């Protein structure tokens, strides 16, 4: 069997690939995730996903390497992972009662070519109270997640509805990723 590598240390991406019953190994890429040039959110996630995959694929050229990057976008502004609880609260206030997009760039590099794509999911939040925001922040859950929330955790209660791929919001558009890996010959 050909080697499949996830170029990510994300526990959520690991769980999703395990859900698909795939045999893979994890080799985090440890790249600089800053985008120094001006890019659209779509271009930014695609570029970061490619950089992550390429950093690993350069050392494993005969393997299939998956790189991914996920961001939350509200009114054309990228909301990354909050650095402080205050920043998390500000992000959640922005998202409260509004719609936003979750974008995941995916790069699959293989001996048979590559697949690069961006998956976009629209998420609608209920109006949140200050108590809900602070109770959620007190759990610590929002601190390592883009947009300061994880749909698969307690923040599921904030989501009114979504349009698109649920797993994309978790961190990896699973079915499309698996189909692309197989299309490339894995």
Curated annotation (Swiss-Prot):
It is an enzyme of class 3 (hydrolase). This is dTTP/UTP pyrophosphatase. GO terms for molecular function: dTTP diphosphatase activity; UTP diphosphatase activity. It comes from Geobacillus sp. (strain WCH70). It is found in: Cytoplasm. The record marks 12, 70, 152 as: Important for substrate specificity. It comes from the Bacteria. Signal peptide: none annotated. The keyword Ribosomal protein does not apply. PANTHER family: BIFUNCTIONAL DTTP/UTP PYROPHOSPHATASE/METHYLTRANSFERASE PROTEIN-RELATED, BIFUNCTIONAL DTTP_UTP PYROPHOSPHATASE_METHYLTRANSFERASE PROTEIN-RELATED.
């Amino acid at each position: 069997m050909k080697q499949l590598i996830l170029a990510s240390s994300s526990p959520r991406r690991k769980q999703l690939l395990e859900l698909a019953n795939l045999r893979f190994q994890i080799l985090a890429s440890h790249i600089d995730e800053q985008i120094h040039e001006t890019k659209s959110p779509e271009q930014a996630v695609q570029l970061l996903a490619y950089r992550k995959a390429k950093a690993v694929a350069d050392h494993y050229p005969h393997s299939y390497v998956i790189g991914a990057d996920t961001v939350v976008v509200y009114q054309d502004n990228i909301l990354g992972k909050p650095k402080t609880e205050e920043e998390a609260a500000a992000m959640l206030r922005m998202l409260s009662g509004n719609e936003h997009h979750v974008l995941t760039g995916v790069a699959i590099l293989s001996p048979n070519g590559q697949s690069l794509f961006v998956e976009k999911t629209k998420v609608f939040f209920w109006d949140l109270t200050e108590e809900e925001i602070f109770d959620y922040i007190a759990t610590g859950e929002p601190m390592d997640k883009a947009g300061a929330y994880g749909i698969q955790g307690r923040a599921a209660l904030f989501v009114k509805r979504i349009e698109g791929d649920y797993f994309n919001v978790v961190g990896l558009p699973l079915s499309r990723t698996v189909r692309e890996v197989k299309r490339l010959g894995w």
